[in-house]
Amino acid sequence: MSRAGNRGNTQARWLGIGLLGLFLLPMYLSLEVSVGKATTIYAINGSAILLPCTFSSCYGFENLYFRWSYNNSETSRILIDGIVKNDKSDPKVRVKDDDRITLEGSTKEKMNNISILLSDLEFSDTGRYTCFVRNPKEKDLNNSATIFLQVVDKLEEVDNTVTLIILAVVGGVIGLLVCILLLKKLITFILKKTREKKKECLVSSSGNDNTENGLPGSKAEEKPPTKV
């Protein structure tokens, strides 16, 4: 009885975990926010940089709220926030903290883009930028993504020497393998032709020997007709 009871409790526990997972899974898959693959981007002092952000929702959205915030070790503030009424409306800004910020997003063609352009960069702009989205249609479900901006005096040139060496080595190895395969095919072809010639020579030599020895099947076997 105790084993049966334990088995029943285990099954009930796993069933409960499975049901909880099915309940929570749509929440994790519905509203997504992305700032691209790069976690850190670099920009030159005095230039402009586009901070990308897109969102997606499996259930659609209405009066979706979004905001960009900035923080570093010393300060934290909201840069811009706004509302996207629906998928046929462009994002509308409610509050903007800095005139250097421009909303570059659009929801047309299902892009769901709420990226911002930050102009006239300063070294103090270095920090973490977070794109936050909340969807009332999904019971105020929210999500966010963060990207780090590093403002530099100049962009460092990437040394591609190692990459070029690796590519050269790989290319050389591939070229060598191709040459080996071609050489192998050539040798195989030559050997095949050599065997065929040897075989022809042996057959021809055998025929000549038969003729000279008067063996059956040779011309020496033929006898002149008997005169009557």
Curated annotation (Swiss-Prot):
Residues 31-148 form the Ig-like C2-type domain. GO terms for biological process: AV node cell action potential; cardiac conduction; cardiac muscle cell action potential involved in contraction; cardiac muscle contraction; establishment of localization in cell; membrane depolarization during cardiac muscle cell action potential; neuronal action potential; positive regulation of sodium ion transport. Contains an interchain disulfide bond with SCN2A. Residues 219-228 have a biased composition (Basic and acidic residues). It is found in: Cell membrane. GO terms for cellular component: intercalated disc; plasma membrane; voltage-gated sodium channel complex. Expressed at a high level in dorsal root ganglia, at a lower level in brain, spinal cord, skeletal muscle and heart. Residues 183-228 are cytoplasmic. It is a single-pass type I membrane protein. InterPro entries: Ig-like_dom (IPR007110), Ig-like_dom_sf (IPR036179), Ig-like_fold (IPR013783), Ig_sub (IPR003599), Ig_V-set (IPR013106), Myelin_P0-rel (IPR000920). Its main location: membrane. GO terms for molecular function: sodium channel regulator activity; transmembrane transporter binding; voltage-gated sodium channel activity; voltage-gated sodium channel activity involved in cardiac muscle cell action potential. Disulfide bonds join C53-C131. The chain crosses the membrane at residues 162-182. Residues 203-213 have a biased composition (Polar residues). Keywords: Cell membrane, Disulfide bond, Glycoprotein, Immunoglobulin domain, Ion transport, Membrane, Signal, Sodium, Sodium transport, Transmembrane, Transmembrane helix, Transport. SMART domains: IG. A voltage-gated sodium (Nav) channel consists of an ion-conducting pore-forming alpha subunit functional on its own that is regulated by one or more beta subunits. The beta subunit SCN4B is disulfide-linked to the pore-forming alpha subunit. Interacts with SCN1A; regulatory subunit of SCN1A/Nav1.1. Interacts with SCN2A; regulatory subunit of SCN2A/Nav1.2. Belongs to the sodium channel auxiliary subunit SCN4B (TC 8.A.17) family. This is Sodium channel regulatory subunit beta-4.
